[in-house]
C-alpha cells in the first residue's frame, strides 16, 4: 500500500457509488483491472466485473494481514506473512524485556475479527498466552479477558515465573 497508496472506500455499500465506479472505469477506457487487497476489495472486484457486464476483466491479488480470505490451506497472503514475521520478532523482544524486568506485557495484534495474526505471532514467539476472537466468541467482555489473564499469571507464578507476555 505504500507505493500504490491505499483506500478504505467500499462502493458496494451504495448502488450509486458502484455505478459511479463502473462509469468512471468505462470512461477511462479501462478493460482490465487488477485489485490488491482483502475480503472487501475481493468482493468489490467481483461486483465491478458483474456491474460492467463483462466489459471489464478483473484479477484480484489477495493481500491482507487478517489472513481471512478463503484461499487453499497453507496459502497465506503476502501481507499476512510480512506482518506475522515482524510481529513475531517484536513479541520475542518484548518477551526478553519481560524476563529481564520481571514484568508482564500485553501485545495487541491487528486483524479485526480474525485471530490469525495474533495466533501466528504468539505461536512464533512462544508467548505465554495468546487470545484469539475465534475462541472467545462474538461478544468478549473485559471481565472474561481479565479472568483468563489472571489465571495465566497465577499459573506462571506457581511455576516460579514472575514474567510473561500475552498476545
Residue ranges and their predicted role:
Residues 1-28:
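Glycine-rich nucleotide/cofactor/substrate-binding loop typically near the N-terminus or early
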Residues 1-8, 63-75, 100-102:
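Gly-rich Lys/Arg/Thr-decorated short loops/hinges at beta-loop-alpha junctions or inter-strand turns
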Residues 10-11, 65, 136-137:
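Residue-level detector of flexible, active-site-proximal loop/helix-junction positions
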Residues 12, 41-42:
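Short glycine-rich, flexible loops that bind phosphorylated cofactors or substrates
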Residues 24, 32-37, 43-47, 51-59, ...:
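Accessory alpha-helical/coil subdomains and C-terminal extensions
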Residues 38-39, 64:
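An acidic- and aromatic-residue-enriched active-site/binding cleft used to recognize and process polar
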Amino acid at each position: 500500500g505504500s507505493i500504490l497508496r491505499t483506500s478504505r472506500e467500499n462502493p458496494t455499500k451504495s448502488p450509486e457509488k458502484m455505478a459511479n465506479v463502473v462509469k468512471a472505469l468505462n470512461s477511462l477506457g479501462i478493460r482490465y483491472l487488477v485489485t490488491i487487497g482483502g475480503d472487501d476489495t475481493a468482493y468489490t472486484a467481483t461486483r465491478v466485473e458483474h456491474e460492467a457486464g463483462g466489459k471489464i476483466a478483473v484479477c484480484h491479488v489477495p493481500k491482507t494481514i487478517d489472513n481471512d480470505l478463503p484461499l487453499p490451506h497453507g496459502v497465506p497472503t503476502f501481507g499476512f506473512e510480512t506482518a506475522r514475521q515482524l510481529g513475531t520478532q517484536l513479541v520475542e523482544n518484548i518477551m526478553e524485556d519481560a524476563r529481564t524486568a520481571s514484568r508482564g506485557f500485553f501485545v495487541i495484534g491487528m486483524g479485526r475479527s480474525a485471530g490469525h495474526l495474533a495466533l501466528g505471532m504468539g505461536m512464533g514467539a512462544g508467548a505465554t498466552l495468546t487470545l484469539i476472537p475465534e475462541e472467545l466468541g462474538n461478544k468478549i467482555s473485559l471481565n472474561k479477558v481479565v479472568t483468563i489473564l489472571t489465571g495465566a499469571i497465577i499459573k506462571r507464578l506457581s511455576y516460579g515465573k514472575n514474567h510473561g507476555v500475552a498476545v
